[in-house]
Amino acid sequence: MSDTAKTVVVTGAGAGAGRAIAARFGREGWRVALLSRDPDRLAAAKAEIEATGGEALAIPTDMADVAAVKSARDQVMQAWGGIDVWVNCAMATLVGPIHELKPKDFRRVVEVTLMGYVYGSQAALEVMRPVNRGAIVQIGSALAYRAIPLQSAYCACKFAIRGFTDSLRCELLHEGSNISVSMLQMPGMNTIQFDWAKNLFDHKYQPVGDEFDPDVAAEAAWRAVHEAPRELWVGGSAIKAIVGQMVY
């Protein structure tokens, strides 16, 4: 994909991997639409892109709200006339044993982490299919293959996103579409996601093993847009978890 006057939408762009991905595309001269719930974090991400000479549009958006997602998409279309890449990265998580989880908390994780990807993908397809081009990138996790204790809601969502993405890819292939769909299976990331998580324990929940810088996700997303792989397994710990699950 050529990088001339391109537009990317990044959800979950206020912090962590989403912000790193947005900054990566901004440094390359892309127009970047930033979607997240927190206006202050969005403003900081926008300023970071503009400081490197990039162009950014900050749109406070709850990805669990389909009307808000479509409204954000429409604002991008009005501002820039098209969307070349849509990166789904927004997430919520819940830490605790299954028997203690409240249905409303579990539902919120599903609405943001799964349905947010569904709504984002649909919003992107509505503008990409008429022009028969574009790329959708789903930020996944090794937990899309290997579920772990105490994060049942998040793991269920990542498994579901993988199934949803595979179905979408098959539909586009059947159409002969030029739209690519890639899923990046990430390792544990050094982000503030567990500071945001609803945690039923008194102590902080932290990934075991190596934690990767969010810039690793940014480079993987950049590669996915230009190479259109079905999946990328990113980082040794993610590869070991996925392959180990397949073998044992």
Model regions and ranges:
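The beta1-alpha1 cofactor-binding region of Rossmann-like NAD(H)/NADP(H)-dependent oxidoreductases
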Residues: 39, 60-71, 103
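Active-site helix of classical SDR
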Residues: 121, 157
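Residue(s) in the substrate-gating loop at a strand-loop-helix junction
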Residues: 141
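Conserved glycine-rich Rossmann-like NAD(P)H-binding loop of the short-chain dehydrogenase/reductase
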Residues: 28-44
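SDR active-site lid
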Residues: 173-248
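Substrate-binding pocket helix/loop in short-chain dehydrogenase/reductase
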Residues: 97-98, 102-110
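Conserved glycine-rich cofactor-binding loop
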Residues: 12-16
